[in-house]
Regions:
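Conserved alpha/beta-hydrolase catalytic His-Asp/Glu region
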Residues: 133-135, 152-208
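Short beta-strand/loop motif that positions the catalytic acidic residue
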Residues: 211, 217-219
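Conserved HGGG/HGGXW glycine-rich cap/lid loop of the alpha/beta-hydrolase fold
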Residues: 14-69
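Gly/Ala-rich beta-loop-alpha elbow adjacent to hydrolase catalytic centers
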Residues: 100-104, 108
Length: 294
């Protein structure tokens, strides 16, 4: 299962590394939107769950992963810009579905509010419109550690909060990845978090009101940072919304254990292809480094 790799020029401003997993029998294409500080590697398990039922597209933000060597990093990217990048990729790959994880939900909501004509359904996982007390504490500590380039504390912060239910192997991957990021990546994350802490989260609900396709909101039962209960606020704004809670799992859903992997896959595929019976897929734990998402 080798992807077709390309670095795409987006509007002459950004170059974006992409991986396209083409499945000959697949009728639909899904693009995956990762979270902050994450790379394409963070979706290794998700790709295995969706391929070959779908063609699968992964990409790295211009400041991250294998995109960053192709860009100058002269200015911070806003969520609006990330949303526009996603719209360009949806058009380029003719994607009918979008699946986001964690902070990737912000750019996805921005993109979907533009009502891209090709997109039929979307899944937004581990995201909520609420900054509750645990999330605020996490973000406030994060912006402090990032601002001081305290790599050790940033790495441990993730594993002791949103990543606390991950297997120890993935925690080691997370720590290694986060503590070795480039300075401009820390700057980008500091910019994002500062904006979240000082802005009106109602902007996500306003974007949600413009969405005219079915959206599944997927959250973990044990995730106290983007809780299933908080995510249900989207139901008052997305006209065609549904909700699924993955039992006995936290923020990282399918990465955390076999049952979470199975249940996440069944929820996603059951939503995207409700007429098909979901086949169970064996869980693969250690395939690639799994980057984390703020």
């Amino acid at each position: 299962m080798r992807p077709e790799i390309a670095v795409l020029d987006i509007q002459g401003q950004y170059r974006v590394y992409t991986e396209f997993y083409r499945a000959d029998a697949a009728a639909k294409t899904i693009i995956l939107v990762n979270g902050s500080m994450a790379t394409t590697a963070s979706f290794a398990q998700t790709v295995k769950s969706l391929y070959p039922q779908f063609n699968v597209v992964l990409y790295d933000q211009p400041y991250a992963g294998r995109s960053k060597i192709h860009n100058r990093h002269e200015q911070m990217l806003t969520k609006e810009v990330e949303g526009q990048l996603l719209l360009e990729l949806i058009d380029h790959f003719a994607a009918e579905h979008v699946l986001s994880f964690s902070w990737g939900g912000a750019a996805t909501l921005v993109a979907l509010a533009h009502r891209p004509r090709r997109v039929e359904k979307a899944v937004i996982s581990s995201f909520s419109p609420v900054i509750n007390a645990p999330m605020r504490d996490y973000l406030e500590r994060g912006v402090d550690y990032l601002g001081n380039l305290d790599r050790d504390r940033v790495g441990h912060l993730v594993n002791s909060t949103i990543g606390k239910h991950l297997p120890s192997l993935f925690k080691r991957f997370n720590y290694k990845h986060v503590s070795s990021l480039a300075e401009h990546e820390y700057g980008q994350m500091h910019f994002h978090i500062s904006h979240v802490l000082n802005s009106d989260r109602l902007c996500y609900l306003k974007a949600a009101k413009q969405i005219d396709i079915p959206v599944l909101f997927l959250n973990g039962e044990w995730d106290e940072y983007t809780s299933a209960q908080d995510a249900k606020l989207f139901g008052q704004h997305v006209a065609n919304s549904s909700f699924s809670t993955i039992q006995a799992t936290g923020h990282f859903l399918d990465m955390e254990h076999k049952a979470a992997c199975r249940d996440s896959r069944e929820a996603v595929v059951g939503f995207l292809k409700p007429q098909r019976q979901v086949n169970r897929l064996r869980y693969h734990q250690g395939q690639a480094q799994h980057a984390f998402a703020i």
